[in-house]
């Protein structure tokens, strides 16, 4: 736990200091911070408390980044894991930087988990889906949202593309300021299935294009989506429409 908290606090501090340095030169800079939007479901009655803890813990990096106050449980956890009160108060004092930020939300079929009584975690699929989980993040931080990452393997890609887009439109209709949507990545990945922990050279067909630069069906659908919705204005937010 100490290593986890140390990693978060140093990464977030580096981001905050980098933002300040950039803003000194470009006061009009806008930062999009991409985060994996996760959710843990309890797999048995005795795991409800643990799932609740993990669902609070998922916000820690963004809480520190955006100067959002954490719960009493998370505050005790941070102090017990090596963060000092002075450090925590420093992060809270940086909240003025959030006005230069938007929130990037990544969502995949693997983002929801079920934790079992033996402590093991298994995939839950999209029980809640992008809408519900992103809404949780938006209600917490109240920042403009961009769907910064999503994909599925090629045989499920088209259905998944439109499913994510419909979730995004529903958020927009419900008043969440939406500023963008990205399929990740442009081309297929290698060893994506092991998060690069094992180098096998396995090609994962999740891109809009193959590694040979041939478009997949999802690429044509993505182009269709862009063409059909190109007239849709960016949701009302504090950000100007980009012209270049």
Residue ranges, per PLM feature:
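Active-site region of glycoside hydrolase catalytic domains
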Residues: 1-157, 166-244
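Charged helix-capping and loop-helix junction motifs
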Residues: 162-164
């Amino acid at each position: 736990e100490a290593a986890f908290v140390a990693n978060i606090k140093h990464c977030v501090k580096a981001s905050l200091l980098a933002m300040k340095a950039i803003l000194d030169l470009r006061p009009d800079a806008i930062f999009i911070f991409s985060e994996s939007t996760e959710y843990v479901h309890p797999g048995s009655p005795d795991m409800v408390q643990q799932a609740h803890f993990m669902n609070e813990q998922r916000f820690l990096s963004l809480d520190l980044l955006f100067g959002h106050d954490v719960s009493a449980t998370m505050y005790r956890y941070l102090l017990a894991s090596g963060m000092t009160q002075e450090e925590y108060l420093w992060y809270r004092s940086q909240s003025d930087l959030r006005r230069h930020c938007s929130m990037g939300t990544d969502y995949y079929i693997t983002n929801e988990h079920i934790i079992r009584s033996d402590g093991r975690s298994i995939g839950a699929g999209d029980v809640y889906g992008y809408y519900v989980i992103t809404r949780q993040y938006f209600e917490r931080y109240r920042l403009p949202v961009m769907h910064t990452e999503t994909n599925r393997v090629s045989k499920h890609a088209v259905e998944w593309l439109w499913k994510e887009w419909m979730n995004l439109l529903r958020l927009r209709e419900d008043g969440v300021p939406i500023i963008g949507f990205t399929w990740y990545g442009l081309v297929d990945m290698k060893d994506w299935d092991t998060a690069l922990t094992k180098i096998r050279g396995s090609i994962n067909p999740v891109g809009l294009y193959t590694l040979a630069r041939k478009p997949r069906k999802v690429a044509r659908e993505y182009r269709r989506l862009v063409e059909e919705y190109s007239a849709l204005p960016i949701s009302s937010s504090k950000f100007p429409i980009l012209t270049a």
